[in-house]
Every structure is written in structure tokens, then in C-alpha cells.
A protein has these predicted regions:
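Conserved glycine-rich cofactor-binding loop
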Residues: 20-22
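C-terminal substrate-recognition "lid" of short-chain dehydrogenase/reductases
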Residues: 241-271, 276
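Substrate-binding pocket helix/loop in short-chain dehydrogenase/reductase
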Residues: 103-122, 126-131, 233
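Conserved glycine-rich Rossmann-like NAD(P)H-binding loop of the short-chain dehydrogenase/reductase
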Residues: 36-50
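Residue(s) in the substrate-gating loop at a strand-loop-helix junction
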Residues: 164
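Active-site helix of classical SDR
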Residues: 145, 180
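Short, small/polar-rich loop/turn modules that mediate ligand/substrate recognition or access, typified
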Residues: 196, 201, 263-265
Length: 281
């Protein structure tokens, strides 16, 4: 892959959760291209294995591991396996996350009469759906950090959490996901302070809108034309387009590089085409 710049990660071990997805698979590839031995962790082994195969085909070092970020014992078993093959973790990218339609509202605004309408409003949000979104995003960041940061406390390291522009201003219709990502940004700051005396830097990246498999149904009609929500998103994004997955790589490499960002901890960098800066007028 073509990198915006390179950093020297030779001798480093990087663990990427959610590595089978569009965004974090690119992050895993970039870390490997810079010399890190990369462990790709995902709930669906076939997805992370395919990415690992792409990386090794380029001559870099990577291996796929099946793991559920909500299973503490399972994560500890994966960590032990990674340590035996690659060594202790130096870089952790907490990329697992997602939303659930049961935690969404159908409409942007609650209107008079909606209480009796055939529409899912705030009052109809499914508790299990909401809890699932918070678990996947927040607990799915907490548990891997508990497991892999334990390997860093004697030598230092870097943790990268994946937040969202939702953390700055929540998007309509997705209250649980917005709240969960706001929690990730807050947690990033908390972790940065907590680990500051043992050389573990903790930072975040807040992607704007990227077209992925996960959100394709929200962004594109069956015939490939943009949905009304896509048109609204692009009007609210000063650059007027979606981001490309490789446009997250510059922020990632900067944050994991001790020489470039050794005094940087507790920040979350928005990579959103100006979305979080635009008031709409």
C-alpha cells in the first residue's frame, strides 16, 4: 500500500481489534508496512484471515486471531497466544465497534402525534439494542485495553481508540452510538492520565463519514444512487465528499510514533473533512 509517510515500527508488536472491517484493515496494513508485527483480532476469523493474507503476500508480518472483545477470558487467551508468537504488545488499536438498528429512531425530530404513529421514536428504543451498542463500543474498548495495556506497563506503549465525529455533536437517529462514541473520547482522556506515569500514551481518532459495508444501506439506495441522508451528510461536510479509508493512516502513524508524538497523549484527532467544524451556515 502507499503510505503518506513512514515511521519506523521495526521490533514493535501491534494488535488491531475489529481488523476485518474496512477502516481498521487499512490501519493494520499500514502498521505492518512500517515494520510492525501485526496481530489482527476479529470475531469472524475468515474476515481477519483474509486481511492477514493480504499483508503477508506483500512480505510483511501478520497473523489473524479469532476473538470477541466482550469476552475477557477469551481476550486473555488471545493475548497469550500473540505474546508467544510475536512478543508483548507495543501498540493497541481498539477498532471494534458498531451500531444496532434497534437502538435507532426512525425520524430526526419527534413531532406531535408520533406517540400514536407507526414509527419508532425515542420511546420505542430497544433496551437490549442500546445496551448492545454501549457494550460493543465502550466495553469492547475497555476489555482489550485491560488485557493488552497490562503488557505495556513495564515498557510503555501506545493505545489508539477509535471514536467518531458523533463524540463532538451527536447525529440524529443514532442516540446510542453517538453516546457510546462520546464515552470513548472521554475514556481516552481518562486512560491517558491514568497511565501517564508508566509511559503508555492513549489517544483517539474520530473518523467522519466513510462509506463502508456497515453503513452502506444508510448511504446508498439499491440502485447505487445516494440516499437523502447521504445528500444531507455531504452538504454538511465542507470537503463535499466521503473519506477514504487510507486517509486515516496519517493520523494513526503520527500518534503511534514516539519520536513524533512522544509528548502527545489524551487527544482525539477528527479526520472528518471539516464536518465537526461546520455550523451549517
Amino acid at each position: 500500500m502507499k503510505l503518506p509517510f513512514t515511521v519506523d515500527l521495526n521490533g514493535k508488536v501491534a494488535v488491531v481489534t475489529g481488523a476485518g472491517g474496512v477502516l481498521c484493515s487499512e490501519m493494520a496494513k499500514a502498521l505492518a508496512a512500517c515494520g510492525a508485527k501485526v496481530a489482527l483480532v476479529g470475531r469472524t476469523y475468515a474476515n481477519v484471515a483474509a486481511v492477514a493474507d493480504e499483508i503477508t503476500a506483500e512480505g510483511f508480518v501478520a497473523k489473524a486471531y479469532a476473538g470477541n472483545v466482550l469476552d475477557r477470558a477469551g481476550m486473555e487467551a488471545v493475548a497469550a497466544e500473540i505474546e508467544s508468537e510475536f512478543g508483548k504488545c507495543d501498540i493497541l488499536v481498539n477498532g471494534a465497534g458498531g451500531n444496532n438498528a434497534k437502538a435507532n429512531t426512525d425520524k430526526e425530530y419527534y413531532e406531535p402525534g408520533d406517540i400514536d404513529a407507526e414509527t419508532k421514536s425515542f420511546f420505542d428504543l430497544d433496551n437490549d439494542g442500546v445496551q448492545g451498542v454501549f457494550n460493543l463500543n465502550f466495553i469492547g474498548t475497555l476489555i482489550p485495553t485491560q488485557v493488552f495495556a497490562k503488557q505495556m506497563v513495564e515498557k510503555g506503549g501506545s493505545v489508539i481508540n477509535i471514536s467518531s465525529m458523533n463524540a463532538y455533536t451527536p447525529l440524529t437517529k443514532i442516540p446510542a452510538y453517538s453516546g457510546a462514541k462520546a464515552a470513548i473520547s472521554n475514556f481516552t482522556q481518562w486512560l491517558a492520565v491514568h497511565f501517564s506515569h508508566v509511559g503508555i500514551r492513549v489517544n483517539g481518532i474520530a473518523p467522519g463519514f466513510f462509506s463502508t459495508k456497515q453503513n452502506a444501506a444508510l448511504l446508498w439506495n439499491a440502485d447505487g444512487t445516494p440516499t437523502a441522508r447521504t445528500e444531507k451528510i455531504l452538504r454538511a461536510t465542507p470537503t463535499g465528499r466521503f473519506g477514504a479509508a487510507d486517509e486515516l493512516i496519517g493520523a494513526l502513524l503520527y500518534l503511534v510514533c514516539d519520536e513524533a508524538a512522544g509528548f502527545v497523549t489524551g487527544i482525539t484527532i477528527p479526520v472528518d473533512g471539516g464536518f465537526s467544524a461546520y455550523s451549517g451556515v
